[in-house]
Amino acid sequence: MYIDNELVIRPIEEKDLEKLWELTYKEESPEWKKWDAPYFEHKAISYEKYLANKDNIINQDDYWIIEVDGNIIGKVSYYWEHKPSHWLEMGIGIYDSHYWSGGFGTRAFTLWIDHLFNTLPLVRVGFTTWSGNHRMVKVGEKLGMTLEARLRKCRYYNGKYYDSIRMGLLREEWEATKFIMKM
C-alpha cells in the first residue's frame, strides 16, 4: 500500500470487487472508455461472470486499485512486454469522471512508479496511449517521461485517425525527477 494524503493505491481485496465491476464492466459504453483505448471493443459482463475471474484480480501484484477518501476511483496496472529483459508497461484508469483533471492520476502514477521501481528489477517503465487522450500524455510529461515513439495515424476512432503514443522513463531519470520534486 502506498499513500499520498487522501489518495491510496493498494492490492485489490474481495470487498472491492462489486464497486470495481460497477466502474469497469457494468455498462456497455462507460464514459471512461472514450479515453481509454476506445478503438478496442468493450463489453459489459455480468457480476457473476466477473466474479468467476476473481482469483486473477484479488491480491495480485500487477493490478491495484486507486482510492480517494476510501472511495474506489480507478486502478493502476502493469504487464510484461518482455519479462526476460524486464520490459514492463504500466497503465492507469480513473473510471469516476468526478476525479478527472484533478491531479489524481498523476499522483497515483507517481506512487505506482515508486512501487514498481522499489519492488522489481526494472531499468525502465512506460505506457502506451493515443493522441486523443491528452490527459494521459500530460501525466507522462508531468512525471518527466520521454516521448519514445509516435506511430502516426494508426488508431482509428469515430471516423478519424490518431497517433499511438509511447512514453517511457528510466530509473535514473525517475530518481532525478523525484529529487527535484522534493526540493
Task: Name what the model sees in each region.
Residues 29-52:
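Conserved GNAT-fold acetyl-CoA-binding loop/helix
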Residues 54-60, 145:
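Short loop/turn motifs at secondary-structure junctions and domain boundaries
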Residues 23, 50-56:
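Residues that form generic nucleotide/phosphate-binding pockets
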Residues 1-19, 23-27, 63, 67-183:
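Acyl-donor (CoA/ACP) binding surface of acyl/acetyltransferases
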